[in-house]
C-alpha cells in the first residue's frame, strides 16, 4: 500500500482549469520570516508554487474530522518531498515555494522543524486565493486551500497539477514535467 492510499482521494472538480496560461498577479506574500516575496517577478528560475491546506503541528490538534476530508491530509509529506528533491529542482532551473492560509508563525515553526530550505508563504489574508480564484474548502469557519501545484515561467502559469491524488508520487510528476519542458 502506498502512502497516498491511506489518504482520502480528492475528485477533479475542475476548479483549477482556468489557471493554465494565467498571468501571476502583482502580489507579495510574507514568508516564514515575515519578509515579503513578490510572485510576479521575472527570474531566471521557474517557480513551482505548491498550495496546500495546512501542515499539522505536534503540539496542536488537527481540525475535527480532518482525516476524512479528501485531499486534506499529506501536507507535511508533500513539503518533505519538495525538500528532499530541492537540489534536483534547482538543477532543473526551478525553485519550489509553498503557500497555505496558515500564519507566518505557523509556517516558521514548520520550516524550522522540517528543515525546509525554501520559502513557505502565508496567504492568511486570502489575497492570492482571491486573485487566482483558487479552489478552497471550509472547516470550522476557516478557509483552506485545496492542494494544487503551478509551474510558473516568466510570470505565466505553464502547468497546473490538480487534483493531486498521489501525494507521495507528485514530486515525480513535477520533476518529469520540468525535464520535458
Where are these regions (language model features)?
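Chalcogenol-based redox active-site neighborhoods
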Residues: 1-181
Amino acid at each position: 500500500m502506498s502512502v497516498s492510499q491511506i489518504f482520502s482521494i480528492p475528485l477533479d472538480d475542475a476548479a483549477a482549469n482556468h489557471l493554465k496560461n494565467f498571468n501571476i498577479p502583482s502580489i507579495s506574500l510574507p514568508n516564514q520570516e515575515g519578509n515579503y516575496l513578490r510572485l510576479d517577478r521575472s527570474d531566471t528560475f521557474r517557480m513551482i508554487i505548491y498550495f496546500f491546506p495546512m501542515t499539522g503541528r505536534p503540539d496542536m490538534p488537527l481540525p475535527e474530522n480532518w482525516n476524512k476530508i479528501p485531499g486534506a491530509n499529506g501536507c507535511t509529506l508533500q513539503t518533505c518531498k519538495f525538500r528532499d528533491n530541492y537540489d534536483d529542482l534547482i538543477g532543473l532551473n526551478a525553485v519550489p515555494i509553498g503557500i497555505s492560509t496558515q500564519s507566518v508563525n505557523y509556517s516558521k515553526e514548520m520550516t524550522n522543524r522540517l528543515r525546509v530550505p525554501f520559502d513557505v508563504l502565508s496567504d492568511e489574508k486570502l489575497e492570492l486565493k482571491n486573485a487566482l480564484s483558487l479552489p478552497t474548502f471550509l472547516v470550522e469557519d476557516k478557509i483552506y486551500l485545496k492542494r494544487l501545484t503551478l509551474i510558473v515561467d516568466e510570470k505565466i502559469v505553464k502547468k497546473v497539477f490538480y487534483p493531486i491524488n498521489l501525494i507521495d508520487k507528485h514530486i515525480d510528476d513535477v520533476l518529469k514535467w520540468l525535464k520535458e519542458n
